[in-house]
Amino acid sequence: LGAMHAWEEAHERYERLFDAHPQVIACDMHPEYLASKWAREYAHEHGLPLIEVQHHHAHIASVLGENELHGPVIGIALDGTGYGMDGAIWGGEILVATRRDFERFWHLPSFALPGGAAAILNPERTAYALLKAYSELNDAFFGQFALDNPQFAPFLERLENRALLDQMIDKGLNTPMCSSAGRLFDAVSALLGICAHPGYDGEAACLLEASAWHGCEGGHPLTARTFHEGLAGAIIEQA
């Protein structure tokens, strides 16, 4: 709320200093963003046209504008949370876009986000939901990530409210579907024990990146070219 009040004061000061009067109002299409609520109210009060823009299209359109391009282009938008056209949480998107419109060409396969926004500060929930989903796949590759893998025993031992999480995921209670790359990074960070209780949105992913930079050199060899379509998208399987 403090940030919102600061924005309102800055907006009023800007209009007064520069005698600026907007003719069109644009905002994120998210129904609950404070800035979007402000934009809708302002447009209504002043009789101005309102343009609501999808979050990830806005990212790509801004890059087009900065580079004086009109498109179409293939744009990749990877972030934490953005309200999708279908009402789901987007965040791992490949869009074919112009400045005016876009087509959602591909996205990270959706996974459960137990607790919705609460999972941002509790990424262990998301990690558990992913492992639970992998466990239900009859697939040799994804079987490596099943809940019965002994490597995940320490994670499961420290996980709280597992029975409640099972109910939420199985029944879809306050558990929206999500295609967010940021939430996926959060889950991996929690699963590895790097950051299970972040203090702010994105901290778990940032600490995961920091750990990766200080990790050992090397890689995981992939020799086959078998693509999996489904929960984990197009993943090249090791022969």
Which role does the model predict for each range below?
Residues 1-239:
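Short acidic/glycine-rich loops and adjacent helix/strand connectors
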